Amino acid sequence: MGTAMTYAVIAGSGSFLPERVVSNDELAAELATRNISTSDEWIVERTGIRQRHLAERGVTTSFLATEAARRALADAGVSAAEVDLIIVATSTPDYVFPSTACLVQANLGAKGGAAFDVQAVCSGFVYALSTADAFVRAGRARCALVIGAEVFSRILDWNDRSTCVLFGDGAGAVVLKAGSKPGILAAQLHADGSQTKILCAAGNVAYGDVTGDPFLRMDGQAVFKQAVTVLDRSARDVCAEAGVELAELDWLVPHQANVRILNFLARKLQVPTEKVVITVDSHANTSAASVPLALDAARRDGRIKPGQLVLMQGVGGGFTWGSVLARM
């Protein structure tokens, strides 16, 4: 008799957003005090964003990540003591080291399991989820906590309206458990380091604050062109790997960059817009947190149901991108 295949199954999800909500009108009024012109109409037309959550001073990535993790564990009916792997995807860690994952582990009271961060910017959660899937399939973990968390507001130039209106803070998490039935069906990760300069942020980190040249720099047109091209190809490749047709997808959960990219991608993939989970209007772009935040929102409001086929995609600085196909 052959050995039974082990799969990684998404057993629960959770999310946490900072209390402060900043509308486009409020942000426009604040920028106007520095003679920077923007408006709700301007932002919505170009991005689809209507508001964002911003962390108050002293609120760190590890705090957001821990709160999202607690909710995911509760949703999965899992105790922290059962977790033997924690992976946090973030570009805004509390420290250079120790990792944010180690801080989350301590906050949860978990001990002994592996804990580390991955940094792939807006692709980070997909990278982390694929990595955790490999651990579970290989028998190296039985219960993994995968988190995307960011305080991107700390690396924005609030005098640059082309970037500061785009981002928000938050965290999302999932619990992966080993199972005998297929959960994550296929995953693919990619990068092109020659495209580093189209989206980057320099600087040093100290307790969640960035020093040096801290600001995010982005070539928006280049990012748009690259993003829709690689996400289209990645979606087709990961579905082919799993033997699934795009038409079989129940939901597409892409990185929430802006609504233009989401709509363009849906058209290229011929996925109806009503099958695309969109939260960028209320969360803005939360980088590594965007995919798990969107996934959790759609699970909790009943859109995503057990047994459905979900494609999660990330794309971000590096340039990085990837896709994970899962049966919920």
UniProtKB/Swiss-Prot annotation:
Name assigned to this protein: Beta-ketoacyl-[acyl-carrier-protein] synthase III
Gene that encodes the chain: fabH
Gene Ontology terms for molecular function: 3-oxoacyl-[acyl-carrier-protein] synthase activity; beta-ketoacyl-acyl-carrier-protein synthase III activity
Matches recorded under SUPFAM superfamilies: Thiolase-like (SSF53901)
Region (ACP-binding): 256-260
Keyword Cytoplasm: yes
One cellular-component annotation, GO: cytoplasm
Origin organism lineage: Bacteria, Pseudomonadati, Pseudomonadota, Betaproteobacteria, Burkholderiales
UniProt entry keywords in alphabetical sequence: Acyltransferase, Cytoplasm, Fatty acid biosynthesis, Fatty acid metabolism, Lipid biosynthesis, Lipid metabolism, Multifunctional enzyme, Transferase
Main location: cytoplasm
Active-site feature positions: 122, 255, 285
Comment text on domains: The last Arg residue of the ACP-binding site is essential for the weak association between ACP/AcpP and FabH.
Assembly, per entry: Homodimer.
Origin: domain of life: Bacteria
Catalysis: reaction(s): malonyl-[ACP] + acetyl-CoA + H(+) = 3-oxobutanoyl-[ACP] + CO2 + CoA
Gene3D superfamilies: 3.40.47.10
